Amino acid sequence: VSNLATAEAMIAAYNAQDVDAYVSYMTDDACEAGYRGDVVREGKEGTRSGLAAAFAKWPQNHAEIVDKQAVGDYVIFREHVTRGPASDGSELVEPFDVVAIYSFEGDKCSRVEFVR
């Protein structure tokens, strides 16, 4: 399976709000972070709990892959994200675009960085 196919499977799991499937594609010490910046979800378990909380807050959350390419051990997606209404009544988040850079070690994703 190619890194591109794995990253696409991660987005499919994300859109299904299946945190277990999403983190199954990650290394144990994987993380999600701002581009060249602070880690926002540390490790597979931190990613699992962080995404579960996000999905509980935004049950209609969805990411559409607008553009994609694979370069070496990296997959780069331009994603259009729609949150929908928040379950806690907080202010609506307008849809936004993000560039996501998936770094791979072997067949597992070790880091996802977001440029927004």
Short names for language-model regions:
Residues 5-6, 15, 45-116:
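A beta-strand edge to alpha-helix "cap/lid" segment located at domain peripheries
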Residues 9-10:
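Generic hydrophobic alpha-helical segments
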Residues 21, 41, 47:
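Short, electropositive, low-hydrophobicity segments enriched in small/polar residues
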Residues 26, 37, 114-116:
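Proline- and acidic/polar-enriched loop/turn elements at helix boundaries
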